[in-house]
From Swiss-Prot:
Protein name in UniProt: Actin-related protein 6
Modified residues (N6-acetyllysine): 260
One Pfam family this sequence matches: Actin
Alphabetical GO biological process terms: negative regulation of transcription by RNA polymerase I; nucleolus organization; positive regulation of transcription by RNA polymerase I; regulation of DNA-templated transcription
Subunit note: Component of the chromatin-remodeling SRCAP complex composed of at least SRCAP, DMAP1, RUVBL1, RUVBL2, ACTL6A, YEATS4, ACTR6 and ZNHIT1. Interacts with CBX1, CBX3 and CBX5.
UniProt-annotated location(s): Cytoplasm, Cytoskeleton; Nucleus; Nucleus, Nucleolus
Superkingdom in the source lineage: Eukaryota
Amino acid sequence: MTTLVLDNGAYNAKIGYSHDSVSVIPNCQFRSKTARLKTFTANQIDEIKDPSGLFYILPFQKGYLVNWDVQRQVWDYLFGKEMYQVDFLDTNIIITEPYFNFTSIQESMNEILFEEYQFQAVLRVNAGALSAHRYFRDNPSELCCIIVDSGYSFTHIVPYCRSKKKKEAIIRINVGGKLLTNHLKEIISYRQLHVMDETHVINQVKEDVCYVSQDFYRDMDIAKLKGEDNTVMIDYVLPDFSTIKKGFCKPREEMVLSGKYKSGEQILRLANERFAVPEILFNPSDIGIQEMGIPEAIVYSIQNLPEEMQPHFFKNIVLTGGNSLFPGFRERVYSEVRCLTPTDYDVSVVLPENPITYSWEGGKLISENDDFEDMVVTREDYEENGHSVCEEKFDI
């Protein structure tokens, strides 16, 4: 019996057999301006010749799976002959879902996995639980960790003790990668070019140029300087999808600091946008979201736990999710948490080698556990007892 591990994120699906490697694939469908009638699914995005003005059709809204038609089509593609050629009669599935997922969504997922696809056994689990499992496997002497999962829709801060989540201390911050990309689109549209329809391009800009500032006000001062002294300023060449397929940053020595470029390239000049956008993760109030930033929320979450456990959490802070890839993210989380923590506590912040696939790797390890069979719900169980057996088994 093989096991398929699917970390079903709101932006990317991380999928692969437990004996194999992982693929990161867009969990959505696309329509392009040029081929209006055709819908592209998942990694068919690579077939789109001109991805400008790309229209996204997402199965998730605000972090919850609501568009089942789109999700089914993405899964059909992933499980079908183009990708994983799943033999449902000989396959179990480990699949992730959000914290405190709605009962109706959980039941729909049971029905689709068991009744439509007919998997032999299912384990539905939070992505953070898989990350915690991976962390405890790598650090067997540790009993506690706090998973900071900063993804597309929002950021969750979840303490785990002996692989059990502490529900009373879970915190959700309503800031994720989607909000950052949208904010960058608004800033650029207001200051330079109208890019409100260019989600795909601006998301790439964000990933290429943004970083987390270690000293926001100092960087702001540098960004105001003229010419060579402004080390923050960068020129980004936008793709035209004929000669330039993917945007890139101009090397500093090629930057024209005054006047215009001779070549016909379309240029975005970015300065304080580079660090002001990721700053929202640390100060959501900058754009009117009255919530704590990530470091403050980590400390607040740990302070909600019994005092004797707190030192163990402070020294096992694990960063996962796409936003943790911003340069400087780990250092900023560490320095701010350190400032807010009693001096006699050790603080350690861990950034895994690949924070996007970290929970998938945890799922791969769980599938190799001796007690894996006790964790899943089999198809016979489900056919006999319905949703109630899933409700008992899965701690969502």
